[in-house]
A protein has these predicted regions:
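A short, N-terminal "cap"/entry segment at the start of jelly-roll beta-barrel domains
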Residues: 1-53, 133-143
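Small beta-barrel nucleic-acid-binding modules, principally OB-folds
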Residues: 54-63, 68-71
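Glycine- and acidic-residue-biased ligand/ion/polar-headgroup-sensing regions
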Residues: 63-64, 73-88
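Histidine-centered metal-chelating micro-motifs
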Residues: 66-69, 87, 99-108, 126
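Ligand-binding loop in jelly-roll beta-barrel domains
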Residues: 92, 103-131
Length: 143
């Protein structure tokens, strides 16, 4: 159950204070509210979406062995690893470790043991990658 106390923002639409129980937010897959389309096996919990700010806060879960190819998007994202393992840019990241990405190519991201992250997007969260990148990457990290 979300606890809410609305207050009108001086800058426009109403913004709401939220304290949210994780157990009350369902995991979603496939097409997520028209905000993003997920590959098979990947799931998200949308915690907050502000269409005015174009800010999307969510938890994202990747299955063991999943590889996200080198990509870019029309936004920045900030990622905090909360469970499991994320391997990127020669680093083996664990809970508490952080990643920042912008509109320049980054990745691939590998999840050899599976992983859960907290991620914030500012702008369009759609990922853009070359089709060849989807096929040519080989996992370099072992479970």
């Amino acid at each position: 159950m979300a606890i809410k106390a609305a207050k009108k923002s001086r800058r426009g639409p109403s913004h709401t204070f939220r304290a949210i129980y994780d157990r009350d937010i369902p995991w979603e897959s496939d097409d997520v509210r028209g905000l993003l389309t997920l590959p098979a096996g990947v799931k998200v919990k949308v915690l907050n979406y502000d269409p005015v700010m174009k800010r999307l806060d969510m938890k994202q879960r990747f299955p063991a062995g999943y590889v996200e190819p080198r990509h870019t998007h029309k936004s920045w994202h900030s990622i905090l690893v909360t469970k499991g393992r994320m391997c990127v840019a020669g680093k083996d990241l664990r809970p508490g470790d952080y990643v920042f990405g912008w509109d320049i190519p980054h990745g691939p991201y590998e999840y050899p043991d599976g992983c859960e992250v907290f991620i914030v997007y500012m702008g369009d969260a759609t990922h853009v990658w070359e089709k060849e990148d989807l096929l040519k990457h080989r996992n370099i990290w072992n479970p």
